[in-house]
Amino acid sequence: MFAMQPPPELPSASPEFTSVEADAAAELIRLALAEDLGDDGDRTGEALIDQEARGRVEIRNRADGVVCGLPVVAQLFETLDERVTVATSARDGQAVGEPGCLATVDDPVRSLLAGERTALNFLGHLSGIATQVAAHVAVVAGTGTRVLDTRKTLPGWRRLAKYAVACGGGTNHRMGLFDGVLIKDNHLAGRGDPLAVASAVTTARDAVPESLPVQVEVDTIEQLTDALRAAPD
């Protein structure tokens, strides 16, 4: 039998959910609600629930983790039905342990049922990212190491995924190809000399504004030695 090791204590972070994240969420919410409700809405809820019925539900965590996505949940229900109110009892970036209430959602039962799965999908996905990142951050705590993210995100989800990384205590790297230079093996191969790292760094630095960082990935000690001659960022 294998002895299970206790998970590392998860850190808490407090990133800001800005209008940029809200705009990104709005587009995803629109697509998600259209995907789930189609043109005819929630057939089951409308068939079984009186349109005047009012109620309250709690959103609760069932495991340890880092919360992320509560503002998206509120935004989703506001988009679905402006009569719905969401009151949070936790915050994004907060590490939670024992199962408890993260938020309460009030009013039209039809709307609560129509939006619950989509809201939980957002909350679960983003909290999962934040929790996994926090676990890695906890492992390297005290070493001076930062945990950075990449561009390997689901299309359309990058802004929110990177927000979730920040909620987990990770560090956002470039948002896209537009806001930084990262020289990779394919760039070096495309130039015809995979070992000429310093030359690529110098060429890139001369070609872009000074405000853009120029960074490089290396696979070997030889590449690292060559790259350091050009002092990449």
PLM region spans:
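Acidic/glycine-rich phosphate/pyrophosphate-binding loops and surrounding catalytic core
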Residues: 2-230
